């Protein structure tokens, strides 16, 4: 019997499919020092670059292709990548013999989950968004359990072993350091407006920031992705990426945040009680960010502007209204907190430890 505790995590494509897994791993590492952690993802990918920063997680590259809902010539080649990914995952699992495989989303997560099913290895897939993406729909047919971030997602997984766990957030968000944002903004006394383009960067938000930063009396923090260079100007700081400690401080202590509406970002904003204006990503997506935002809008927990209707004047007016209307500001901040499950990382980690116990006892 394999008594060494090993767990494979898999997921990627964006930071929103990686950071929740890291949050779970951090909690597991804190609770049990005798677990080996592995991450299966694509070489040179977002997940590869992020996992490299965590020396206690072994990264193993697997091939995978994107499964599209629309016609594309790439579908013909990507289906073979998925098959190769399943085959490689099969032999990796046989070699390392993990007791559990945990998927955090993205197309790279499907081959390991399918391979785990073939080898009768316990597997769990976690859907971060309100409604499941294609990868999770596939994973749910093979996984032992399904974890969901929104209670409302239960309806998509009828006759399945589904558990509402919330979405794990990075440990740095539990106690943000106010000194960090003070240093980043050079101790500004102006309102702080932070604009995030997501882990891949968003051209529309980058252009928006450059167009409005000199039209509002505020300090702008701009996370731009890799398509722009980092810079610091008067009342403006731009960086391609901020580390977890910086992001936690920026989100907690900014007056207003303007962002895409990925599920991971929403949960981090909720943990901080942030005042957020969402500009959901629509083009080329399944509309998950629109639906993520809709459920917050219904609870008066955010403001939203559709990208197709986005204009400088509209966003400027919205920012000015928030900065001058304390009642509205407070309502938005208080209502978004309702979407934060404080014990999510701890809950999932303890569930996994119980799974280890059950597996080793059988």
Curated annotation (Swiss-Prot):
MF-aspect GO terms:
UDP-N-acetyl-D-glucosamine:N-acetylmuramoyl-L-alanyl-D-glutamyl-meso-2,6-diaminopimelyl-D-alanyl-D-alanine-diphosphoundecaprenol 4-beta-N-acetylglucosaminlytransferase activity; undecaprenyldiphospho-muramoylpentapeptide beta-N-acetylglucosaminyltransferase activity
Pathway given for this chain reads: Cell wall biogenesis; peptidoglycan biosynthesis
Q: Which GO terms describe its cellular component?
A: plasma membrane
From the UniProt record, list the reaction(s) this protein catalyses. di-trans,octa-cis-undecaprenyl diphospho-N-acetyl-alpha-D-muramoyl-L-alanyl-D-glutamyl-meso-2,6-diaminopimeloyl-D-alanyl-D-alanine + UDP-N-acetyl-alpha-D-glucosamine = di-trans,octa-cis-undecaprenyl diphospho-[N-acetyl-alpha-D-glucosaminyl-(1->4)]-N-acetyl-alpha-D-muramoyl-L-alanyl-D-glutamyl-meso-2,6-diaminopimeloyl-D-alanyl-D-alanine + UDP + H(+)
User: What does the record say about its membrane topology?
Assistant: Peripheral membrane protein
EC number(s) given by UniProt: 2.4.1.227
**Location of this chain's protein in the cell:** Cell inner membrane
Q: Which InterPro entries match?
A: GlcNAc_MurG, Glyco_trans_28_C, GlycoTrans_28_N
Q: Which GO terms describe its biological process?
A: carbohydrate metabolic process; cell division; cell wall organization; lipid glycosylation; peptidoglycan biosynthetic process; regulation of cell shape
* Binding positions for UDP-N-acetyl-alpha-D-glucosamine per the UniProt entry: 14-16, 170, 199, 289
**Record key words, sorted:** Cell cycle, Cell division, Cell inner membrane, Cell membrane, Cell shape, Cell wall biogenesis/degradation, Glycosyltransferase, Membrane, Peptidoglycan synthesis, Transferase
Q: Which HAMAP family match?
A: MurG
Family recorded in the similarity comment: Belongs to the glycosyltransferase 28 family. MurG subfamily.
The function of this protein is: Cell wall formation. Catalyzes the transfer of a GlcNAc subunit on undecaprenyl-pyrophosphoryl-MurNAc-pentapeptide (lipid intermediate I) to form undecaprenyl-pyrophosphoryl-MurNAc-(pentapeptide)GlcNAc (lipid intermediate II).
The protein's name: UDP-N-acetylglucosamine--N-acetylmuramyl-(pentapeptide) pyrophosphoryl-undecaprenol N-acetylglucosamine transferase
Q: Name the source organism.
A: Borrelia hermsii (strain HS1 / DAH)
Q: What is the lineage of its organism?
A: Bacteria, Pseudomonadati, Spirochaetota, Spirochaetia, Spirochaetales
Q: Which gene encodes it?
A: murG
């Amino acid at each position: 019997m394999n008594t060494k505790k090993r767990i494979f995590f898999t997921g990627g494509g964006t930071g929103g499919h990686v950071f929740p897994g890291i949050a779970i791993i951090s909690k597991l590492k804190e609770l049990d020092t005798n677990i080996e952690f592995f991450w299966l993802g694509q070489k040179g990918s977002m997940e590869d670059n992020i996992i490299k920063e965590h020396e206690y997680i072994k990264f193993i590259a697997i091939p995978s292709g994107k499964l599209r809902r629309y016609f594309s010539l790439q579908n013909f080649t990507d289906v073979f990548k998925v098959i190769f990914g399943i085959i490689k995952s099969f032999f990796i699992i046989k070699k390392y013999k993990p007791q559990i495989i945990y998927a955090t989303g993205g197309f790279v997560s499907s081959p390991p989950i399918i391979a785990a099913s073939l080898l009768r290895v316990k597997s769990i897939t976690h859907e971060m968004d309100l409604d499941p993406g294609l990868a999770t729909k596939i994973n749910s047919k093979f996984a032992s359990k399904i974890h969901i971030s929104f209670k409302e997602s239960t309806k998509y997984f009828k006759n399945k072993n589904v558990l509402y766990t919330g979405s794990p957030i990075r440990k740095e968000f539990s106690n943000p350091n106010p000194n960090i944002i003070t240093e980043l903004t050079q101790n500004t006394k102006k309102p702080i407006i932070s604009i995030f383009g997501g882990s891949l960067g968003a051209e529309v938000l980058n252009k928006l920031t450059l167009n409005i930063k000199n039209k509002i009396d505020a300090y702008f923090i701009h996370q731009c992705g890799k398509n722009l260079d980092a810079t610091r100007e008067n009342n403006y700081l731009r960086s391609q990426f901020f580390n977890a400690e910086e992001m936690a401080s920026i989100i907690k202590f900014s007056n207003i945040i303007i962002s895409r509406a990925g599920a991971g970002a929403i949960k981090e904003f909720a943990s901080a009680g942030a005042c957020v204006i969402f500009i959901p990503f629509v083009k080329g997506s399944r509309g998950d960010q629109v639906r993520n935002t809709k459920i917050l809008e219904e609870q008066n927990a955010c403001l939203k502007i559709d990208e197709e209707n986005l204009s400088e004047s509209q966003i400027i007016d919205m920012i000015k209204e928030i900065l001058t209307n304390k009642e509205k500001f407070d309502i938005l901040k208080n209502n978004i907190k309702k979407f934060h499950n404080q014990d999510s990382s701890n809950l999932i980690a303890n569930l996994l430890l119980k799974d280890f116990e059950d597996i080793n006892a059988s």
